[in-house]
Amino acid sequence: MSTVLRFGIPKGSLEEATVDLFKQAGWQIGISSRSYFPTVDDGEMKCHLIRPQEMGKYVERGTIDVGIAGRDWIRENDSDVVEVCEMVYSKVSRRPVRWVLVVAQDSPVQGPEDLQGATISTELVEFTKRYFKERNIQVNVEFSWGATEAKVVDGLCDAIVEVTETGSTIRANNLRIVCDLMESVPVMVANKAAWEDPWKRAKIEQIATLLNSALRAEGMVGLKLNAPAEKVEAITGILPSQKAPTVAHLYKSDWVSIESILPEKEVRRIVPELLRLGAEGIIEYPLSKII
């Protein structure tokens, strides 16, 4: 049994966000511009820098045991892998991206069915072919090497299938979204044989748990305070929490200590109310993980 887990780090737009997420979860990953083999402070892991577009096939073959890539590229390659978990993060935000069907603003196209016999340009060729084939719409799908939005503007194709988070670039180029084809988030995928290996599966699950706990902690803080015991109901009534605030009596005192986890943006609203109710010694502290 191998005691090293081969992990694929997505190269490109997700690279920095992934390294930052690992750091928050407890792993230090170092990436050199001169190497495709990142360093990691875990003797049980070996990291590989791999394009998300190719992650699925390398995981399926067993070249690597597990990796992170967008679900869009896993579906594009129709990869036969185990989806361990979703991990909702991206280069811009913590929300899914969308693959959308786009035409020029003045195009008469109102739906996919209006593109019968049309030429569509995209990076997501195989998925797009399947999408239209399932709807009995005959189209010519061409691979785009980049600058896809410009092609429909220049009349080089009738429509494009492009990825977006906010749609702002599409609107800025005087283009119009016809419909959404797919929503995608990063997913952790594992090789089937690796998933059946007890040691590797346990290691994969450990990593997945800690990465997702780091995601859950983003934007959250801990708040701790002391208050008179008679104010507990009033204070816990305004204090958000994961389940219920923790309340503990102070030693030889009729005061209590109250602790809770809440969104950071709520602190500025709640602190004045806590002070008004007699709270003292209010401490706000950052969270790296919520498990």
Curated annotation (Swiss-Prot):
InterPro entries named among the record's database cross-references: ATP-PRT_HisG_long, ATP_PRibTrfase_cat, ATP_PRibTrfase_HisG, HisG_C, N-reg_PII-like_a/b, N-reg_PII/ATP_PRibTrfase_C
Domain of life (superkingdom): Bacteria
Record function comment: Catalyzes the condensation of ATP and 5-phosphoribose 1-diphosphate to form N'-(5'-phosphoribosyl)-ATP (PR-ATP). Has a crucial role in the pathway because the rate of histidine biosynthesis seems to be controlled primarily by regulation of HisG enzymatic activity.
Catalytic activity: 1-(5-phospho-beta-D-ribosyl)-ATP + diphosphate = 5-phospho-alpha-D-ribose 1-diphosphate + ATP
Family under the similarity heading: Belongs to the ATP phosphoribosyltransferase family. Long subfamily.
Primary localisation category: cytoplasm
This protein's GO CC annotations: cytoplasm
Protein name: ATP phosphoribosyltransferase
Organism: Trichlorobacter lovleyi (strain ATCC BAA-1151 / DSM 17278 / SZ) (Geobacter lovleyi)
Pathway: Amino-acid biosynthesis; L-histidine biosynthesis; L-histidine from 5-phospho-alpha-D-ribose 1-diphosphate: step 1/9
GO biological process annotation, one example: L-histidine biosynthetic process
Gene this chain is encoded by: hisG
UniProt EC number: 2.4.2.17
